[in-house]
Amino acid sequence: MPPRPRFDRRAPVRELPNINERIKYPQLRVVDSDGKQLGVIDRLKALEIASQRELDLVLVSEKANPPVCRIMDYGKYKFEQEKKAKEARKKSHQTEVKEVKMRYKIDKHDYDVRIGQATKFLKSGDKVKCTVIFRGREIQHSNLAETLLLRMANDLEEQSEVQQKPKREGRNMIMFLSPRKTPLIKKDDA
């Protein structure tokens, strides 16, 4: 007896589109290539009209009563659908949570670097998790860490809004910032 294969070598079953002879409904509501309704026609008559125009009969809506078909060039239609799907994939941006870590005794330049990193993350549409790390007895100074995080939120006010206020989580204090949908308009004191 031959050994059993570890995986299925058959080609995956692809669902074929409902066009031309694959449409099994006897009555169809037909729309021509210009968008003009031809009314409810039987399937054979609709196929005949499509072949006269050298186009395909494509099932658009199966759930309608009777099902809706359109007379169009299926190759061109498929290409347009793939192009739209590709554009949609390109435009969709997965929001990630980026982290900026620091200690509560951070120097000015290091703080400016963290602000720059957070700004870059927010401009690219990602959320920012600001973390202040405590070591040893530093946890007693959580009020200084909270002040630092609030200062950071204030400095990033134009690009972000506070999603979660500073709170202690284990040996860290964290705060979440999310990018602003609309730019903040500052009021002038005049």
Swiss-Prot record:
The keyword Nucleotidyltransferase does not apply. GO terms for cellular component: cytosol; membrane. One of its GO terms (biological process) is ribosome disassembly. It comes from the Bacteria. One of its GO terms (molecular function) is ribosome binding. InterPro entries: T_IF-3_C_sf (IPR036788), T_IF-3_N_sf (IPR036787), Translation_initiation_fac3_CS (IPR019813), Translation_initiation_fac_3 (IPR001288), Translation_initiation_fac_3_C (IPR019815), Translation_initiation_fac_3_N (IPR019814). It is found in: Cytoplasm. The keyword Protein biosynthesis applies. Keywords: Cytoplasm, Initiation factor, Protein biosynthesis. Its main location: cytoplasm. Monomer. Belongs to the IF-3 family. IF-3 binds to the 30S ribosomal subunit and shifts the equilibrium between 70S ribosomes and their 50S and 30S subunits in favor of the free subunits, thus enhancing the availability of 30S subunits on which protein synthesis initiation begins. This is Translation initiation factor IF-3.
